[in-house]
Amino acid sequence: MATPTELGFSSPGGGGDDSDDNPPQKRTSKRTASETATEEETKKKKKKKTKHNTKMASPPSNRIWNEEDELSILKGLVDFRAKTGLESKIDWDAFYCYVKGSIHVKVSKCQLMSKTRKLKKKFLDQMEKIDQGNDPHFTRSSETEAFGYSMMIWRKIDAEYTNGVMDKAHQSESGEEVFEEDEEVALIDKGAAKSGKSPHEAVVVVDKITTKKNGTAGKESDDDDDDVLCAVRDAFETTMMSQGLSDYQKKLQLEKLMNLGTGKRRELSNEWKALCVEELKLNINKLRFSAKLAEAANDGK
């Protein structure tokens, strides 16, 4: 028979004390897990906020030009050449005044010339890859449109570039940037600028000006007639060279054209230039349609 002491030791009260010790430990464990989860969520929120603030505090991009600006420059160059009749010579003062309104930020003439040069190099690099058998892959309609405009402007010098004879830029005495070969710059002479003419009034063809050493513009010479002869020759080579004529027949017909009277030659020259302008406009419309077509194909609508 158990003694009172033994009964008291094993009494329900003692068992109750043991049962009362366990629940607080479990509750403490649950609180710790909950608090840990809350702290982790708080840390994650702080990290996200820190990253967001870092992005907001990052310095703005130094990029000046966007894709719309590049298209404005290229389209402006095509339109400007069509209106002025300057195929290979550009008056950058007049072109700057012509195109600056379509650019979303204010840029200088030097920045415009530099950007144009970069666009030219980009196009020539693309053509070099195409000649190597690598077709371009345009993912945006703006890229297709830019390439088409570049073709209108610089396709004549593509062969020279791919043969390693890319024309180089140099500085003229008046500080204007000049491009050799097909992108010569028709600079406004200092003397003409002093006469008070605006850039739009001072658009001149370099072939028509004899520039003196002191910087004043000379009188128009026989270069005007040379320009007419060049236009007639270009018209003949473009339209008649593919007619299946022999070399002798071509030479004979060209000599006859060169010996025409001044009035008749000028008439043919003016008509050919007008046709070239119309062809440029047609190419622009085709290019815009191609861009819309490519965009519709990409969207699938």
Curated annotation (Swiss-Prot):
Tissue specificity field: Expressed in the apical meristem and young leaf primordia. Detected in the vascular tissues of cotyledons and leaves, in hydathodes and in the septun of siliques, but not in roots.
Region described as Disordered: 1-62
InterPro entries documented for this protein: GEBP, GeBP-like_DBD
Subcellular location: Nucleus
Transcription found in the keyword field: yes
Location of region: Non-canonical leucine-zipper: 268-289
Keyword flag Transcription regulation: yes
Keyword vocabulary terms for this entry: Nucleus, Transcription, Transcription regulation
Annotated GO biological process: regulation of DNA-templated transcription
Feature: compositional bias, Basic residues: 44-54
Primary location recorded for the protein, binned into one broad class: nucleus
GO cellular component, one term: nucleus
Protein function: Probable transcription factor. May play redundant roles with GEBP and GPL1 in cytokinin responses by regulating the transcript levels of type-A ARR response genes. Involved in stress responses. Plays a repressive role in cell expansion by counteracting the positive role of CPR5 in this process, but does not regulate cell proliferation or endoreduplication.
PANTHER family: BNAANNG10740D PROTEIN-RELATED, GLABROUS1 ENHANCER-BINDING PROTEIN-RELATED
Quaternary structure note: Homo- and heterodimers. Interacts with GEBP, GPL1 and GPL3.
Family assignment from sequence similarity: Belongs to the GeBP family.
Entry protein name: GLABROUS1 enhancer-binding protein-like 2
Native organism taxonomy: Eukaryota, Viridiplantae, Streptophyta, Embryophyta, Tracheophyta
Gene for this chain: GPL2
